[in-house]
Curated annotation (Swiss-Prot):
Family of the protein in this entry: Belongs to the transferase hexapeptide repeat family.
Cross-referenced SUPFAM superfamilies: Trimeric LpxA-like enzymes
Repeat keyword on record: yes
SMART domains: Mac
UniProt keyword Metal-binding, yes or no: no
Native source organism of the sequence: Staphylococcus aureus (strain COL)
One of the record's GO molecular function terms: galactoside O-acetyltransferase activity
Enzyme nomenclature, EC number: 2.3.1.-
Domain of life: Bacteria
UniProt keyword annotations, A-Z: Acyltransferase, Repeat, Transferase
Protein name: Putative acetyltransferase SACOL2570
C-alpha cells in the first residue's frame, strides 16, 4: 500500500517523510495562501480557488480568511456551508460536512492522531480518523472536533467545546469534553419564532 492508501484506510502511515503527501500538502498550502491574500470582494476568484482547493464544484460555500487545510481533496462539502475566520481542516482522514452548516471562528477539525510512544512519534507515524458533520448544524467559536467523531443532523455545538465522542442528532452539546445538554426541538415551524422559542 502507498502511504496515501494507508492514510485513507485509517492505518499507521508515514505522514512526515512520504514525498507524495509532502507535495500534496504543499499544493494545498499554496492555494490557501492565495485564497488568504485574495480580496473578499473578488468573489469569482475566491470561488475558483475554493473549487481548486477542494477539487470539486462547490455550491454556495463561503470561507472567511484566514483558512487552512492539509490536502483539501479529503474534505467533502455540502451546499450552503459557511466557514468563519481562522478555521483549520486537518483532513488526513476524510471530513464530510453536510448542507446548511455554520462553522464559527477559530474552529478546528482534527482527524490526526499520533503514537503515545515518542520513539514511534518521532519517526513520523500518524493515523487519521474521519469526521462526519450532519446537515443543519452550527458550531460556536473555538470548537475542536477530534478524530472519529460524528455529529448528528440539526445539532448545535457550544463555543469552546472539545468534541471527543459522537453527538446525536438534534442535540445542544457543550463543554470539554463536549456533552449533550438537551435535545433541540427542530419541528417548530418558522412562524413560531419569538424570544421564547428561539432559545
Amino acid at each position: 500500500m502507498t502511504e496515501k492508501e494507508k492514510m485513507l484506510a485509517e492505518k499507521w502511515y508515514d505522514a512526515n517523510f512520504d514525498q507524495y503527501l509532502i507535495n500534496e500538502r504543499a499544493r494545498a498550502k499554496d492555494i490557501c495562501f492565495e485564497l488568504n491574500h485574495t480580496r473578499p470582494s473578488a468573489t469569482n476568484k475566491r470561488k475558483e480557488l475554493i473549487d481548486q482547493l477542494f477539487q470539486t464544484t462547490t455550491d454556495n460555500v463561503s470561507i472567511s480568511i484566514p483558512f487552512d487545510t492539509d490536502y483539501g481533496w479529503n474534505v467533502k462539502l455540502g451546499k450552503n456551508v459557511y466557514v468563519n475566520t481562522n478555521c483549520y481542516f486537518m483532513d488526513g482522514g476524510q471530513i464530510t460536512i453536510g448542507d446548511n452548516v455554520f462553522i464559527g471562528p477559530n474552529c478546528g477539525f482534527y482527524t490526526a492522531t499520533h503514537p503515545l510512544n515518542f520513539h514511534h512519534r518521532n519517526e513520523g507515524f500518524e493515523k487519521a480518523g474521519p469526521i462526519h458533520i450532519g446537515s443543519n448544524t452550527w458550531f460556536g467559536g473555538h470548537v475542536a472536533v477530534l478524530p472519529g467523531v460524528t455529529i448528528g443532523e440539526g445539532s448545535v455545538i457550544g463555543a469552546g467545546s472539545v468534541v471527543t465522542k459522537d453527538i446525536p442528532p438534534h442535540s445542544l452539546a457543550v463543554g470539554n469534553p463536549c456533552k449533550v445538554v438537551r435535545k433541540i426541538d427542530n419541528d417548530l415551524p418558522s412562524e413560531t419564532l419569538n424570544d421564547e422559542t428561539i432559545k
